[in-house]
C-alpha cells in the first residue's frame, strides 16, 4: 500500500503546537473591514485552536506533518 500523502491545502492553513494541538487562522479576514467593529477585527487577528469535533478529521489530513 502506498504512503498517505499530506493534504497540502490543509498543511498551509494549520500549524501544530508543541503540545500537539492545531492552530488555525480566523475566517472573515480578507476584505470588507469597514463593516466590522474594532473589537471584531482585533479578535480576528488572534489565532485560534481547532475544535475537538474537527480535530480528528484534520489530523488525518495532516498525518505526516511535523
UniProtKB/Swiss-Prot annotation:
<keyword id="KW-0687">Ribonucleoprotein</keyword>
<dbReference type="GO" id="GO:0006412">
    <property type="term" value="P:translation"/>
</dbReference>
<dbReference type="GO" id="GO:0022625">
    <property type="term" value="C:cytosolic large ribosomal subunit"/>
</dbReference>
<feature type="compositionally biased region" description="Basic residues">
    <location>
        <begin position="1"/>
        <end position="26"/>
    </location>
</feature>
<dbReference type="InterPro" id="IPR018265">
    <property type="entry name" value="Ribosomal_bL35_CS"/>
</dbReference>
<feature type="region of interest" description="Disordered">
    <location>
        <begin position="1"/>
        <end position="28"/>
    </location>
</feature>
<dbReference type="InterPro" id="IPR001706">
    <property type="entry name" value="Ribosomal_bL35"/>
</dbReference>
<dbReference type="InterPro" id="IPR037229">
    <property type="entry name" value="Ribosomal_bL35_sf"/>
</dbReference>
<dbReference type="GO" id="GO:0003735">
    <property type="term" value="F:structural constituent of ribosome"/>
</dbReference>
<keyword id="KW-0689">Ribosomal protein</keyword>
<comment type="similarity">
    <text>Belongs to the bacterial ribosomal protein bL35 family.</text>
</comment>
<dbReference type="InterPro" id="IPR021137">
    <property type="entry name" value="Ribosomal_bL35-like"/>
</dbReference>
<protein>
    <recommendedName>
        <fullName>Large ribosomal subunit protein bL35</fullName>
    </recommendedName>
</protein>
<dbReference type="Pfam" id="PF01632">
    <property type="entry name" value="Ribosomal_L35p"/>
</dbReference>
Amino acid at each position: 500500500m502506498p504512503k498517505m500523502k499530506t493534504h497540502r491545502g490543509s498543511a498551509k492553513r494549520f500549524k501544530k503546537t508543541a503540545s500537539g494541538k492545531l492552530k488555525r487562522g480566523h475566517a472573515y479576514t480578507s476584505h470588507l473591514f469597514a463593516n466590522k467593529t474594532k473589537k471584531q477585527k482585533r479578535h480576528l487577528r488572534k489565532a485560534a485552536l481547532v475544535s475537538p469535533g474537527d480535530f480528528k478529521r484534520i489530523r488525518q489530513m495532516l498525518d505526516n506533518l511535523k
